[in-house]
Amino acid sequence: VRPAKVVVLGAGTVGWNAARTAAAMDAEVLLLDRSPQRLRSLEADRRGRLMSVVSSRGLLERLVPTADLVIGAVLTPGGRAPTLVDAGMVQQMRAGSVIVDVAIDQGGCIATSRETTHTDPTVTIHGVQHYAVGNMPGAVPFTSTEALVSVTLPYILGIAGRGLEEAVTERPELLSCLLYTSDAADDTDSV
């Protein structure tokens, strides 16, 4: 039996974990991202049949039609997800292949994706099963809450224990999620 061929679009948290999970199940995994720096940062933790490649339109056109599973995990903070896979690519996939569009909360990154629900999670389009449930973590609220807490708790404890300025000095990544305000900005008399 040949290993499943999995194409993961996006090397963020979701894409990286999906790729690692598929590789641990002996799938042949191609992880694509547009950032060579992001892909390089993941190299040390790569296992099994997982290859990472800088994404391009031509590469997608070659890989998607041959995939057994395509996972769309791109994230555009504050915006709509780019459509990376067009209907023509989906039409070329083998019947029974599967698409999971995690980016559906941002409009989806697969042209044929339509939001589905936890009660009716899949739809078949061009012979390909699509799973595009919005708020996927909602299916496992306890587990997703534990995961969120495990990631955010160190930051919360750092801010609570040392104050914001020292926490930002120790963890500069906090700067990207701070909203700066001043008393002058809250002056409603000047509006």
Each language-model region and where it sits:
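A conserved FAD-binding loop/helix module that cradles the flavin
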Residues: 140-149
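Internal hydrophobic alpha-helix adjacent to the cofactor/substrate pocket in enzyme cavities
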Residues: 153-163
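Rossmann-fold NAD(P) dinucleotide-binding segment
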Residues: 66, 79-95
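Glycine-rich phosphate/diphosphate-binding loop of Rossmann-like nucleotide-binding domains
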Residues: 1-67, 72
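Flexible, glycine/charged-enriched surface loops at secondary-structure junctions
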Residues: 161-174
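Rossmann-fold NAD(P)-binding glycine/threonine-rich loop
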Residues: 89, 93-130
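Conserved small/polar residues in nucleotide/adenosyl-binding loops
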Residues: 180-187
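Glycine/threonine-rich flexible loop motifs
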Residues: 77-85, 109-114
